[in-house]
Structures are given as C-alpha cells and as structure tokens.
Amino acid sequence: MNIDQSKIPQATAKRLPLYYRFLKNLHASGKQRVSSAELSDAVKVDSATIRRDFSYFGALGKKGYGYNVDYLLTFFRKTLDQDEMTNVMLIGVGNLGTAFLHYNFIKNNNTKISMAFDVNESKIGSEIGGVPVYDLDKLEEHVQEVGDIPVAILTVPAVAAQPITDRLIALGIKGILNFTPARLNVPEHIRIHHIDLAVELQSLVYFLKHYSITQED
C-alpha cells in the first residue's frame, strides 16, 4: 500500500514511535496479537485514538481479533524507516549533552549520534560514549568531511543557539532538536522541535495545582 505520509496528522506521526517501541517489547515476549485496549493501557493513549491513528494506514487489524504483532511491527519498522540509519550531530557537551552521548539512543535502530562539538578544550579531542568530540570552531570542516548529517541536537547556552543554528543552516541541516530556551529562527524548509525542560516542569506544576486529572482532555 502506497501511503502519502504528508497527509498523516502530525499528532499521529508523533505517536508512531511510541507504538513501535511497545510492539517491539510484545514481539520479544512472544505475544502474537494485541487489542487496541491492551495497546491503550500500555502506551496511555485511549483506544479510540489508537484505532483512528491506525486507520490512516488502512486495515491493520481485524474486528474481534485485534492486531497481529508481527505484521504491525514489520509495517511500522518500514513506515518509520527503522532500517535506514540517520546520523546526528550534538552541539554542546555539558551535563545534558554528555548524558545524550552516553545514551546515544541505543534503543533506536535508525538514529545515532556520530559526532559532537564543544568549545571546552578539556573535552575537545576526547571520546564520550564512543562519540568523538570536536572543536566547535571547526564545525564546518568536520561536517563537510563526513557529508550527510541531516539532524542536530542543540544543548548549548541560549545566547549561542541562534548563531550556531545559522551555521547549521548554511551546512544544509534539515532538522534540529532544540533543548535551549531560545526560540530559533529558521527557514520554512527546516523542521525544528523545541524541548524546554524548564517550561515543561512549570507546566506540570501549574496543572497539578489548578487542574484535576478528570478535567483534562
């Protein structure tokens, strides 16, 4: 089945890796089929939403039977390009950046941090989690040597985020995962995801104080 991925709602697309991770766990445990209710309980997404998400991809299950785990796993592996490796660069090897290098998305088959950059001389030239750390001043040199690194993770001070982003744009970056408080200006063809941990924490505290669980959607 040929599916126009651009017509899949972004909210649905963001949930696909969550479904895929749970299906991998089911497959590893030997489970052969799963219902939308079981999926719902595991991933904390209501079953109606799961059925709607899956409906964008055609008939993935059978009424009264549920979903075949092997079939779903194979389908979502292909949909999420799990067999195609995407190299990622990390910029900013502070506490958060160092944690990313040690983790390096080992549970993902299709993403890998292949190089990191920093300005700290004590880190330049070292390896952290098997990832080489280079001088940020030589960003262009190292990226051009390697070639295709379409994604960058930013874990730098906010004041440095936009100037570094401008350099990444010039290098042809396609996507940025931004962990800085800065709201970055990028061309329309570049996708950027902002993850501000301080804002997320403040939002959580606000909801705890002012909303009960039953009030939320």
UniProtKB/Swiss-Prot annotation:
Coiled-coil positions: none
Primary location group: cytoplasm
Keywords from the named record: Cytoplasm, DNA-binding, NAD, Repressor, Transcription, Transcription regulation
Pfam families: CoA_binding, Put_DNA-bind_N
Name listed for the protein in its UniProt record: Redox-sensing transcriptional repressor Rex
Subunit structure: Homodimer.
PANTHER family cross-referenced by the UniProt entry: REDOX-SENSING TRANSCRIPTIONAL REPRESSOR REX, REDOX-SENSING TRANSCRIPTIONAL REPRESSOR REX 1
Family in the record: Belongs to the transcriptional regulatory Rex family.
Portion annotated as DNA-binding: 18-57
Gene3D superfamilies: NAD(P)-binding Rossmann-like Domain, Winged helix-like DNA-binding domain superfamily/Winged helix DNA-binding domain
UniProt keyword NAD, yes or no: yes
Subcellular location: Cytoplasm
Disulfide cross-links: none
UniProt xrefs under InterPro entries: CoA-bd, NAD(P)-bd_dom_sf, Rex_DNA-bd_C_dom, Tscrpt_rep_Rex, WH-like_DNA-bd_sf, WH_DNA-bd_sf
Signal peptide location: none
Function description: Modulates transcription in response to changes in cellular NADH/NAD(+) redox state.
Residues annotated to bind NAD(+): G92, V93, G94, N95, L96, G97
Gene Ontology BP terms: negative regulation of DNA-templated transcription; response to redox state
GO molecular function, one term: DNA binding
